[in-house]
Amino acid sequence: MGAGETGSVYKVRRAVHPIRACVTVPGSKSVTNRALFMAAMACGHTVLEGALFSDDSRHFIGSLEALGYNVAVDEVDKRVEIEGLSGKIPNRTGTIDVGSAGTAARFLTAMLALSDGGYTINATPQMQARPMDSLFEALTELGAEFEYFGEKGHLPVKVRGRGCHGVPDKNCSPDNAQNTAFMDTGTGNAGDRPAVVHIDISRSTQFLSALMMAGVLIPEGLDIKITSEKTDGAYIRITSAMMKAFGCNVEYDGHDYHVGAGQRYNTGKYYIEPDISAACYFWAAAAVTGGSVTVRESRYGMMQGDMKFLDVLKKMGCTVNQTGEGIQVDAPDGGILKPVDVDMNDFSDQSMTLAAIAPFAQGTTRIHNVGHIRLQESDRIEAVLTNLRAMNIECGTFTEDGKEGIYICHGIPQPAHIKTFDDHRMAMAFAVTGLAADGIVIENPMCCRKTFENFFDVLEAVLSKN
């Protein structure tokens, strides 16, 4: 980390001049980890270009390696190569560690639950605290069995795949034939009824993404019945688009989902989009410092839901343009930001970014429908309010139609130590506040290793050029 680091804190340097920069951000975590799953389940050699290398993706890669997959990694060129085995998992037993990666935890649990092997899934205390019960219940409905080592409905667990149902444990030993997640390597029987599963996705759409991607492993197909009011979302659309790119289709009827029978993931070369979640911090930096920031290789039409944050910045008065290098955000003329009233349920990772810049808007900003973020890497609502209040910013929660939101009033942020709660997004979002306020210090800044390990180095480079 660069010049702002002192021990276990990072002292944010207030920008002396408007930030004007063109920055490169890493590949998308959401896209990288979905691509890793599909490549492992494909038949043959797949190359992933522009991959993210961070704690989350390394835990996903490490888990695949622990399961016996041949994975070649080139962190310099941001490339991962995987030999897929048509749904076969090389090792019939084993232990994986998903760290704090929600995508790895949810996606790999579904993969292993549809196998005929027995596996242990470990995680950090942070991930152990996050909900998994809805996914465990759905996979149990499909025939998997779970043994909990701690609290029921949470990691760590031992999973016994649906292919072991009614089969003695000795038949899931390493001495037997290679495990296969595809229960049949044929095309499936058109006369077979699809398997059926029910899932509540109100707390995380990763549960549905896991079932969609793993559903390809069921030869007769899978009908996914949604039991929650929420039935769709930006990350679900990412999953569906990526499955289509890898040769598999999912039908959505406006409420439920159907994964067709006899599908397989294709191999080839797949390019990982830049991480728009990471890009948003730098676009927000332009907004609060009166500057202009372009994020290289970003473009309109990208599938990541956080692209909607650009619409929020427009409502605040910023100008957004597509350039040859990438999307450029310019602060409003005169530097005055407008308050906004916005539902961020579909791109809630940016609710923290908006909360961090909202004090600079000339009025009260209201962020609707984000109650589910209490159950993520931290209680993100409480963490945001704690840090805003530490800066002497008036803020609080409200409920509308039974859904929780946050309001943030205009104010001048006072010097404060930002508690990250080991949450990468808290560290990066409030670093943006510090670009336009004095005395902002980020505690435990390296929690950003989860998704953007050199974030503060990039930030320092930007500041050094302005």
Question: How should these model regions be labeled?
Answer:
Residues 1-466:
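Structural preference for solvent-exposed beta-strand-turn elements
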